Design a protein with these regions (language model features):
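Phosphate-binding loop/pocket of nucleotide- and phosphate-handling active sites
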Residues: 131-132
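Glycine-rich phosphate-binding loop signature in dinucleotide/nucleotide-binding domains
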Residues: 1-5
Length: 132
């Protein structure tokens, strides 16, 4: 039997089964290409997220790392990073900027915090403990 302590979803555009989520409470991290609770939930993945952000006219978007629960993109938020939307952005350009400026930074940071035992979850609130 494996001793799995953390599952990381990056570019995994599928909803996990209830059994999988229940087997790893507060031990599955996902990165979402928006500032949750905006542009998230069932159907909000990939380029669609950035299309919706541009269509809505928001000035800032970003990325969120959160623990996975039974609700798509509904788990407790670990880290977020904002990214400006620039005039002339296309969904593809925005997607790339969000990946490079936010996702690629906060996902490894969240994994590191988890592995150091520095994340505490109470309800929807994630607290980051001071490092030693």
């Amino acid at each position: 039997e494996l001793d799995i302590q953390l599952v990381v979803l990056a570019g995994f555009m599928h909803i996990l089964t209830e059994e999988m989520v229940a087997a790893y409470p507060n031990a599955i991290l996902n990165v979402h290409p928006a500032l949750i609770p905006s542009f998230c939930g069932a159907g909000y993945y990939g380029l669609h997220v950035h299309e919706k952000a541009l269509d809505y006219g928001v000035k800032v978007t970003g990325a969120t790392v959160h623990f996975v629960n039974e609700e798509p993109d509904g788990g407790p938020i670990v880290l977020q990073k904002a990214v400006d939307i620039l005039p002339g952005d296309t969904p593809e350009v925005l997607q790339r900027r969000v990946m490079e400026q936010a996702e690629w930074h906060i996902l490894p940071q969240a994994v590191s915090l988890f592995c150091q035992g520095r994340l505490s979850v109470e309800g929807r609130i994630v607290t980051i403990k001071e490092g030693e």
